[in-house]
């Protein structure tokens, strides 16, 4: 049994065993467990397991273990559960326990009452896009490599025909994700809203207006102008699939079982398909145009001030899980402007974390527990994966989290002051974002990164530590 498999067993032991887990999923850094009985979870024990970088209590219990490790840990848990990743785990011990089920239903009802509509919306957005993040990263970096090679070709540094062919091939691979993002979004949105995923994918594909030409366009019913493929972007897709889920569920209730498989999907697609083309695409197009205009105005006019605010407050948004609201905004910015000028500023938040961690490493030489945590979390922090540093280092200590935010604010102010530094895709951050910087503004982005590193280091070195942190061999209070 390797180290990651052992970690999976230790985590399961702390949460009450596999019999106390109803469902297992994961994202880039977190194992997300749906717990049957929260009273059986030993949180102090869970947080002190070597390899656990943080624990977040939410609708699902989220255990931060870091990139790469999360795949191995989740795979071992799934192996022990006997089901596939994401499937509900059957439990022989409680299938007939009506009392436990009633208590669970009561907890879920109370939890739903506590959740605001905004929290529900944010969680839905997160659940739609989190599974797509690896594809965003892979396709984005491949597109970045193609862009760098194309710049060399344009500059005359490279002229070989095979390089031109390679650039074309890399762009085809990149567009396998980005060109059909509406379909992927529709598919995932259907899963989140409880509709048939395939139908959601079809609705997403409808927005691409396949087969429509300039000679025979579909007119916008509100303006009379021709609709443009992808108009309304993913905002329109999400709204349309949400309505699809309502229509499909209603039809399942009223259509006889004998013809349900034929009638329900046909009527659902016909109704929502027409509404998507003639209503959702124009309306969502208006919304997305306004949203993009506002964001570009805030960044363009606010400059240094806007950059500081975004860079400084992005980490608290990540901590609260509210940062996912920016995902559709990034995508709309890329669709309309060719780049998102918001992402490089937000990326400075992670750079401030890196600077803070380096300062803690230097200042807290006697705190081997803290230095061990930094050693494990810092390398991926440079690459833009900040959760291990947030939940494993700065947030438990308190004060360094604040100084890291200030460092991110300085980096954001620098990016905002330079201006027009955008990214052509989303997903990566930190150094990993460098190949995706638009219009060859690499130097400006590097200056911003270095500024955030330095500011995070200075703020934390002078104001972010206490005597206890420096001398005691522990992490947090």
UniProtKB/Swiss-Prot annotation:
Its EC number is 2.7.1.-. It is a multi-pass membrane protein. The chain crosses the membrane at residues 128-148, 167-187, 192-212, 227-247, 267-287, 298-318, 342-362, 377-397, 401-421, 443-463. One of its GO terms (molecular function) is protein-phosphocysteine-N-acetylmuramate phosphotransferase system transporter activity. Residues 123-477 form the PTS EIIC type-1 domain. Keywords: Cell membrane, Kinase, Membrane, Phosphotransferase system, Sugar transport, Transferase, Transmembrane, Transmembrane helix, Transport. Residues 91-113 are annotated as: Disordered. Pathway: Cell wall biogenesis; peptidoglycan recycling. Residues 92-104 have a biased composition (Polar residues). It comes from the Bacteria. InterPro entries: Glu_permease_IIB, PTrfase_EIIB_Cys, PTS_EIIC, PTS_EIIC_1, PTS_IIB_1, PTS_Sugar-Specific_Components. Residues 5-87 form the PTS EIIB type-1 domain. GO terms for cellular component: plasma membrane. The active site is at residue 27. Its main location: membrane. Coiled coil: none annotated. GO terms for biological process: peptidoglycan turnover; phosphoenolpyruvate-dependent sugar phosphotransferase system. The phosphoenolpyruvate-dependent sugar phosphotransferase system (sugar PTS), a major carbohydrate active transport system, catalyzes the phosphorylation of incoming sugar substrates concomitantly with their translocation across the cell membrane. This system is involved in the uptake and phosphorylation of MurNAc-GlcNAc, the principle peptidoglycan turnover product of S.aureus, yielding cytoplasmic MurNAc 6P-GlcNAc. This is PTS system MurNAc-GlcNAc-specific EIIBC component. It comes from Staphylococcus haemolyticus (strain JCSC1435).
């Amino acid at each position: 049994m390797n180290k990651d498999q052992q970690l999976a067993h230790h985590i399961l032991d702390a949460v009450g065993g596999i019999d106390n887990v109803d469902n297992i999923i994961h994202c880039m850094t977190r194992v997300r467990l749906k717990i049957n009985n929260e009273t059986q979870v030993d949180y102090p024990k869970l947080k002190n397991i070597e390899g656990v970088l943080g624990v977040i209590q939410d609708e699902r219990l989220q255990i931060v273990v870091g990139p790469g490790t999360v795949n191995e840990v989740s795979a071992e848990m799934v192996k022990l559960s006997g089901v596939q990743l994401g499937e509900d785990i059957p439990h022989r011990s409680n299938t007939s326990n009506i009392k436990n089920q009633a208590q669970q239903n009561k907890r879920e009802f109370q939890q739903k009452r506590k959740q605001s509509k905004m929290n529900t919306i944010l969680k839905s957005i997160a659940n739609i896009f989190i599974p797509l993040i690896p594809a965003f990263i892979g396709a984005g970096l491949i597109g970045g490599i193609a862009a760098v090679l194309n710049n060399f070709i344009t500059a005359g540094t490279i002229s070989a025909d095979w390089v031109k062919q390679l650039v074309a091939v890399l762009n085809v691979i990149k567009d396998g994700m980005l060109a059909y993002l509406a379909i992927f979004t529709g598919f995932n949105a259907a899963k989140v809203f409880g509709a048939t995923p395939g139908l959601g994918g079809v609705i997403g594909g409808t927005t691409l207006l396949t087969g429509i030409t300039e000679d025979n366009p579909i007119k916008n019913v509100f303006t009379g102008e021709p609709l443009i493929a992808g108009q309304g972007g993913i905002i329109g897709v999400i709204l349309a699939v949400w309505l699809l889920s309502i229509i499909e569920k209603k039809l399942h209730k009223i259509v006889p079982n004998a013809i349900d498989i034929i009638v329900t999907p046909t009527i659902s697609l016909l109704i929502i398909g027409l509404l998507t083309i003639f209503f959702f695409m124009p309306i969502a197009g208006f919304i997305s145009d306004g949203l993009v205009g506002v964001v570009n105005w805030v960044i363009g006019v606010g400059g240094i001030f806007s950059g500081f605010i975004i860079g400084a407050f992005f980490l608290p948004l990540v901590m609260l899980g509210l940062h996912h609201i920016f995902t559709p905004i990034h995508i709309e910015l890329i669709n309309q402007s060719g780049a998102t000028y918001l992402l490089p500023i937000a990326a400075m938040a992670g750079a401030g974390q890196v600077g803070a961690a380096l300062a803690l490493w230097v200042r807290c030489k006697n705190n081997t527990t803290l230095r061990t945590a930094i050693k494990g979390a810092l390398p991926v922090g440079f690459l833009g994966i900040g959760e291990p540093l947030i939940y494993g280092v700065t947030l438990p200590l308190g004060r360094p989290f604040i100084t890291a935010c200030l460092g991110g604010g300085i980096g954001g102010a620098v990016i905002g002051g330079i201006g027009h530094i955008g990214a052509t895709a989303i997903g990566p951050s930190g150094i990993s974002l460098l190949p995706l910087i638009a219009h060859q503004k690499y130097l400006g982005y590097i200056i911003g990164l270095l500024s955030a590193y330095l500011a995070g280091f200075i703020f934390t070195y002078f104001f972010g530590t206490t005597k206890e942190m420096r001398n005691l061999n522990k992490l947090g209070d």
